[in-house]
């Protein structure tokens, strides 16, 4: 059995795991002469295909085997037709993958054999359809049959010997592979054991060295502590008085310096607090003054806006009144002019009491069209002088105006603002 695997594939599956097997039928029956050679050839082709392609697919494998003269087809169930004819000549190939999974048949494409030429007599006899009478004597002699039997026996012995040799070779190969694997495993186990022993020895040596160093350090520390204690006891008795006096003096000086520093810090803090309070009071007063000034300015601006709005309204009302007065004056002047014209006509009619002359009659009898075409007589209009208005800007005299009326019209003049 030969195995070959490719890690990745594209078209037929993500992975292809190929395994070559011989069918069970071939093992049960008589062995074929070229069975081992065909399996070896197929395994060699598989190895070449795997080495030649980075990602081996089922299509590429079929192409490689087809170029070498082999045909690959999926195995059909045993009950279908055509299985008995090809069961002895194919090599079983098992492919496992995501999409291409199953058993495939691989067999050598056999070339068509040339038929032996027939004699003319046989052709003629077959063509005419005549049956040839067989002689009661057999065609082959017995000596030839014995030789054939012996040859078959020899061939069977050789086949058995070849089969035994192949089995021995396979067993030797398996034993060699197993021995190699066992030797590799034993070598790996030995190397691991050696590395573990070395690491344990190193760790033990390190632990021993560290323990020795610790023990020496402890012993030296104990001895130094004992000697230091003894020397300190001796020196402490001597220097205790001196150190006590010096420490008392230093403590007194330190307390005095600390008290002075604290007093200075407190005084500085008080002065800073006072200055900050003064600055804050000044800032508050300034802000209050600014707020008051802004409020006063805002109130003044509002008052000015209110006064200006009132003045504008007053001016608008006065202008409207003046316009109305002017219109009334114009209307009165027009009425006076009409009244005067009517009075003048009445006077002329009263004065002309004499009978009508022929010219007047003719003029009166003129057609209406000529009368319409005659130009109208101009009417005298009186020119009126505009009223002069004076307005005092003082707040106490708001609403009071000085008016002057024209002497010709006699009507009161209009009031306005300058």
Curated annotation (Swiss-Prot):
The modification Phosphoserine is found at residue 38. Residues 292-330 form a coiled coil. Residues 345-357, 395-418 have a biased composition (Polar residues). Residues 114-273, 344-418 are annotated as: Disordered. The keyword Cell inner membrane does not apply. Residues 172-186, 212-244 have a biased composition (Low complexity). Keywords: ATP-binding, Chromosome, Coiled coil, Developmental protein, Differentiation, DNA condensation, DNA-binding, Nucleotide-binding, Nucleus, Phosphoprotein, Spermatogenesis. It comes from Rattus norvegicus. GO terms for molecular function: ATP binding; double-stranded DNA binding; nucleosomal DNA binding. This is Testis-specific H1 histone. GO terms for cellular component: chromatin; male germ cell nucleus; nucleus. PANTHER family: SERINE/ARGININE REPETITIVE MATRIX PROTEIN 5-RELATED (PTHR39414), SERINE_ARGININE REPETITIVE MATRIX PROTEIN 5 (PTHR39414:SF1). GO terms for biological process: chromosome condensation; negative regulation of DNA recombination; sperm DNA condensation; spermatid nucleus elongation. Its main location: nucleus. It comes from the Eukaryota. Residues 127-149, 157-171, 187-211, 245-259 have a biased composition (Basic residues). Essential for normal spermatogenesis and male fertility. Required for proper cell restructuring and DNA condensation during the elongation phase of spermiogenesis. Involved in the histone-protamine transition of sperm chromatin and the subsequent production of functional sperm. Binds both double-stranded and single-stranded DNA, ATP and protamine-1. Residues 260-273, 359-379 have a biased composition (Basic and acidic residues). Belongs to the histone H1/H5 family.
């Amino acid at each position: 059995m030969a195995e070959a695997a490719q890690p990745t594939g594209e078209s037929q599956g993500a992975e292809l795991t190929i395994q070559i097997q011989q069918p069970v039928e071939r093992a049960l029956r008589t062995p074929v002469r070229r069975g081992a050679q065909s399996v070896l050839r197929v395994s060699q082709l598989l190895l070449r295909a795997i080495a030649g392609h980075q990602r081996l697919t089922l299509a590429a494998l079929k192409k490689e085997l087809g170029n070498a003269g082999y045909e690959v087809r999926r195995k059909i169930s045993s009950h279908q037709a055509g299985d008995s004819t090809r069961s002895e000549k194919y090599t079983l190939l098992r492919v496992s993958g995501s999409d291409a999974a199953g058993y495939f048949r691989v067999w050598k494409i056999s070339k068509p054999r040339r038929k032996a030429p027939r004699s003319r007599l046989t052709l003629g006899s077959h063509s005419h359809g005549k049956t040839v009478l067989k002689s009661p004597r057999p065609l082959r002699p017995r000596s030839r049959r014995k030789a054939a039997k012996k040859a078959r026996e020899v061939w069977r012995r050789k086949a058995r010997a070849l089969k035994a040799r192949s089995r021995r070779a396979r067993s030797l190969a398996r034993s060699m592979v197993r021995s190699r694997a066992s030797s590799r495993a034993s070598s790996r186990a030995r190397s691991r054991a050696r590395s573990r022993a070395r690491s344990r020895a190193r760790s033990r040596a390190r632990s021993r060295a560290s323990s020795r160093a610790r023990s020496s350090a402890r012993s030296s520390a104990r001895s130094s502590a004992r000697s230091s204690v003894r020397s300190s006891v001796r020196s402490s008795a001597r220097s205790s008085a001196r150190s006590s006096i010096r420490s008392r003096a230093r403590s007194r000086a330190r307390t005095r310096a600390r008290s002075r520093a604290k007093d200075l810090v407190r005084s500085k803090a008080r002065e800073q607090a006072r200055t900050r309070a003064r600055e804050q009071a000044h800032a508050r007063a300034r802000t209050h003054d600014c707020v008051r000034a802004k409020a006063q300015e805002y109130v003044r601006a509002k008052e000015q806006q209110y006064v200006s709005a009132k003045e504008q309204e007053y001016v608008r009302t006065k202008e409207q009144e003046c316009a109305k007065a002017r219109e009334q004056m114009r209307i009165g002047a027009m009425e006076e002019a009409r009244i005067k014209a009517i009075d003048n006509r009445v006077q002329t009619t009263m004065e002309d009491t004499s009978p009508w002359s022929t010219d007047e009659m003719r003029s009166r009898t003129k057609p209406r069209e000529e009368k319409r075409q005659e130009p109208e007589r101009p009417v005298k209009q009186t020119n009126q002088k505009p009223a002069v208005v004076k307005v005092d800007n003082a707040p106490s005299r708001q609403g009071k105006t000085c008016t002057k009326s024209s002497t010709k019209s006699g009507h009161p003049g209009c009031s306005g603002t300058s």
